[in-house]
């Protein structure tokens, strides 16, 4: 099965879950298919998926990540001893962990093709990340507080882990309380 076949298989599998999309036609253009697949992954609520789907999704995302290019620590300039700064797509980093600017629900951004980092991380990690985060939040029984963090496996990302943290939501003027929440 090649990437085109995998992508179509995944789209069909996700469309089957949504009766309202039963008549939707899969576009012939690969770029449009990629956007449709990402959209379907983004709006999918956390729930189990069969192993055949997950294996094909994992193969698809692995190849997509390889095609984007994986950046290791050796590729990044050290600015001070043990301090490296990367400007770019963090879903390409093959490092110990990346940090996700998560929302308090911790299950990712549900807006189709939104380019926030939360959406990108959940897309390229695969649907297992949303399921894992959902299970974690069910056990926790409350939203994640600002300034706290949770660590998860990275699933299909080239890094080892994802650290999810919720930043303060500032509406109006920045206050001392907002500043304290950043520490």
What does each model-found stretch correspond to?
Residues 1-183:
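Macrodomain-like recognition of ADP-ribose-binding/processing modules
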